[in-house]
């Protein structure tokens, strides 16, 4: 098995994947540190178990209840043996996850003495380990280096003891896979009394054995999540060294199943169970079905992979292969593409120092950092699942990126938040990309990921091939432009209403009338829905019927007999509207640039059922309140000049955008960035030529298909007045426009900037199906400053055309006269 390392699985890993992991079809999954994947036969085995046995609540004496109790006891023992833990020395407490186990320990330490406890933790700890510091009444300390830990251990016996001390650290960094000295636990125990260790093994146990056979060297508390090992069930464990169990003696709270007697009238008294640690700590009814599923997980895991040693060997081989390929990848000028964050002493061939996780960022040939969010988005389009951000490891990430606390506070003040796309600040990355391998990873995963990096981020020559020549004077004096189509999107992120030919449409400072005046909001979170998460929203098609005064909404495929229709009055009277707060920051895919917006939600059950039933999401329609626009257009800038040193010959080279003065900023309703979005038919045509001429990907069949202009969701599509042929067009010339006039009244529009694109352009607006184009091609041909651009943001000028606001209209066929940036 020379090309697969020393893996000794019972079957070839590719055979296992084909049989057990159909969910991996056409997908490259590289986020096993988040959760690994469950096997098909695990779910089937658990299902057979549930349908063949009657399991009752364990807190009863009935036969079904006793069966549950027996299974829980057996699986608890099996879990201890899985980690080579002697049940005479250790007990295992079932909890929701590793974080719940950490909190249980920290809460118990806080209650163990009147003054509380002292807490120390390693800088490379998971956020949940860091959070325990807030409960430490005596104080806390973050150890920035291993040397600091070593020095502290050596002086433990000389330090004054004010109360119990707890030192926590990860067995393996969830950020970069670096493994920590296991010997600290035993040394701390030997060096001082009343000092305990908490070891976070959640990341480690995903791909490595965790051996507790030597109780004297073991941590006092170990926390883990079983889904990291098996993918399912969602269950965690706290493994307690019994000699440290007295820490829980003064725990105040008790729940059902943890007491032998409780008095509630008169004297308030209770007697805790004393037979085992887990009986005292497992409050209420155990998640016994999840625990029973854990039994199926142990069986399946052993049958598929043999042992954790096998998994460790397999993933170590793959990680080394990936690391070698990433660190040797070069641009045309010899500069490294991948910057891997790895301690110098760790080695991907040594399981005592390194696990199968790679933390990295990408750089251009000139050394500029490439934004993590953009890489993750592009990977997602290619069905490659990776992780980006601070990876729930704030200290390790900050240390790797050399960010100080003052730096991060400044970033927070500038608007940076967890999960947003503030990728680069002060010229440095704010987060990290992570690839993590699992038991069922294979060489194809490595090849696919490296092929993705090479295709999109390795610069093979000093110049990027331009699709158009630089702007020349004669180009600005050739045939003119006209409005090819007008589109209004009454419900944000839903289908377009095409303004009929010959119909003049009113335009205001907020944009085309009725554009993005409504949105769909999640009834639980208040978050606005969007096509990135719910692509079927493209099949919700509004029609503005001015003659009847209604917004007629149709759901379903065109000409489908199952289509349903709902009519919403355009008039706000008698519309069952309730004012509510639309919090855009409650989830990552913020749809209104992070603004918190007050909207009026429709309270009618008929309205909410219409949209909820179609999307399969509990949602309702909401409307932007009248005369209350406090949102202002803020198109994203920073495109760089046409002489940018990073992309000197980029197609449609971007001129420097001029910032809009605060006094002239335009109000918007529920649009993302600006009142109006414009694209060019010639640019769409050129993009499609590029798409059709590019090679297909591994998972594609046949020639790539052109995309419709509708995927860009523009309000205005302009076309050139060709005398013929179409090849005479000027694609991307709109990038040179500073302003334009439209129609017989010469309505003046300012160009605010270029439109930054995301994966939503991959949703086919006719079928609601997501693909990889045009985002893949845009990423190669329309990137500037690590952002992808296509189309231009517009706003109607507030003065200078002599027309009153209410008389401004545009129509399909109107002449468009652009003004160009100066040289």
Swiss-Prot record:
GO biological process: Mo-molybdopterin cofactor biosynthetic process
Record region (Disordered): 628-667
Cofactor annotation: pyridoxal 5'-phosphate
Superkingdom of this protein's organism: Eukaryota
Enzyme active site: 392
EC numbers on record: 2.8.1.9
Keyword Transferase among record annotations: yes
GO molecular function ontology, one term from the record: lyase activity
MOSC domain sequence ranges: 644-819
Keyword annotations from UniProtKB, A to Z: Molybdenum cofactor biosynthesis, Pyridoxal phosphate, Transferase
Disulfide bond annotation, renumbered to this chain: none
Pfam families tied to this protein: Aminotran_5, MOSC, MOSC_N
Signal sequence, renumbered to the chain: none
Function (record text): Sulfurates the molybdenum cofactor. Sulfation of molybdenum is essential for xanthine dehydrogenase (XDH) and aldehyde oxidase (ADO) enzymes in which molybdenum cofactor is liganded by 1 oxygen and 1 sulfur atom in active form.
Family to which this protein belongs: Belongs to the class-V pyridoxal-phosphate-dependent aminotransferase family. MOCOS subfamily.
Protein name per the record: Molybdenum cofactor sulfurase
Protein species of origin: Aspergillus niger (strain ATCC MYA-4892 / CBS 513.88 / FGSC A1513)
